């Protein structure tokens, strides 16, 4: 994948560098200085584009805007989330570059030619099972008191999340939880286009589990409902895609009944039925709308978490 990042952006860098220097360190495609700089800037810019595009589409088209009125929502939270995310990306890119550099030098097991389409499901399953396991233990490790306060606590500033919360963390936190995805292709063979798709899917999944849209209350799939509990109660649901490792590690907590009543498609159905009867969810048409259902649900979970911590 690193070779694609360089090949398709080489003309842009050639034109830019030729305007300011004649040094072969920046003009030669074989120069390590040029390669490292180009990889770093590409990762920073593409990471920002993917984050802003994915989170913005989710925020403006799917996210329940009533959640912004929740009392646990911080002042200017969305702006602060975006700022922290974009501030962290260049630093995350610096420590991520070596993975791509050594891939370029032939140390990874990525390959260009697909021999059989049957390779795809096996590789995808392996990738997601591998990363699900390692991300769980890395994430749980970041909750250890020795590192939590400076490394992972910035991400838990957001008790009530928005899609922009997905990458709003300390740069080393983001890097640590991305390492399993990079490590996988150094241990197991994978087709380059599939790796790229899987990597993008991983980023979009991270956005989806912070968006407050409860599509699933499944016992196996770890959804936004599970991750909302993690942000509110801290010591549960560390997993990324499934509840498997939370169950093994004794940190699984099933979403409370309020979540089951707020599944996304059920809400759409109820809202449609309400509109047919001249009402909208949360208040009469044209009237003053009440607190949104997601905000109400979050309040219920927060209250339950407080009771649990106090021993009630």
Question: What do these predicted ranges mean?
Answer:
Residues 1-37, 60-74, 145-312:
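Cytosolic/stromal cytosol-facing helical appendages immediately following the last transmembrane segment
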Residues 29-92:
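Alpha-helical transmembrane segments in multi-pass membrane proteins
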Residues 36-44, 86, 121-125, 175, ...:
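Hydrophobic alpha-helical transmembrane segments
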Residues 47, 51, 124-135, 181, ...:
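Alpha-helical transmembrane segments of multi-pass membrane proteins
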Residues 54-63, 96-104, 135-143, 185, ...:
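Membrane-water interface at transmembrane helix exits
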Residues 70, 79, 94-130:
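Juxtamembrane helix-loop-helix connectors linking adjacent transmembrane helices
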Residues 87-96, 103, 172-185:
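Core segments of transmembrane alpha-helices
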Residues 117-156, 165-166, 178:
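Function-critical hydrophobic alpha-helical transmembrane segments in multi-pass membrane proteins
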């Amino acid at each position: 994948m690193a070779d694609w990042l360089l090949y398709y952006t080489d003309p842009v860098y050639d034109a830019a560098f030729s305007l300011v220097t004649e040094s072969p360190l920046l003009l030669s495609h074989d120069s390590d200085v040029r390669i490292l700089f180009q990889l770093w800037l590409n990762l920073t810019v593409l990471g920002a584009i993917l984050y802003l595009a994915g989170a913005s589409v989710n925020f403006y088209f799917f996210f329940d805007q009533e959640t912004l009125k929740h009392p646990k929502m911080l002042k200017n939270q969305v702006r602060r989330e975006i700022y922290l995310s974009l501030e962290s990306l260049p630093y995350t890119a610096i420590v991520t570059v070596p993975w791509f550099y050594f891939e370029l030098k032939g140390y990874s097991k990525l390959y260009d030619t697909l021999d059989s389409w049957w390779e795809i499901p096996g590789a995808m399953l392996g990738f997601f099972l591998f990363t699900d396991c390692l991300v769980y233990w890395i994430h749980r490790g970041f909750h250890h008191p020795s590192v939590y306060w400076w490394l992972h606590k910035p991400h838990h500033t957001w008790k009530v999340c928005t899609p922009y919360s997905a990458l709003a963390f300390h740069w080393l936190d983001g890097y640590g939880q991305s390492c399993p995805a990079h490590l996988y292709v150094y241990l197991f063979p994978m087709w380059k286009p599939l790796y790229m798709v899987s990597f993008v899917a991983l980023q979009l999944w991270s956005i989806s589990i912070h968006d407050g849209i409860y599509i699933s209350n499944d016992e196996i799939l770890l959804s936004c409902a599970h991750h909302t509990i993690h942000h509110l109660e801290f010591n549960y649901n560390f997993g990324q895609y499934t509840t498997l490792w939370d169950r093994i590690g004794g940190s699984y907590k099933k979403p409370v009944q309020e979540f089951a009543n707020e599944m996304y498609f059920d809400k759409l159905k109820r809202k449609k039925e309400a509109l047919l009867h001249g009402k909208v969810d949360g208040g009469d048409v044209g009237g003053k709308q009440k607190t949104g259902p997601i905000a109400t649900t979050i309040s219920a979970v927060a209250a339950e978490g407080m009771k649990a911590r106090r021993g009630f």
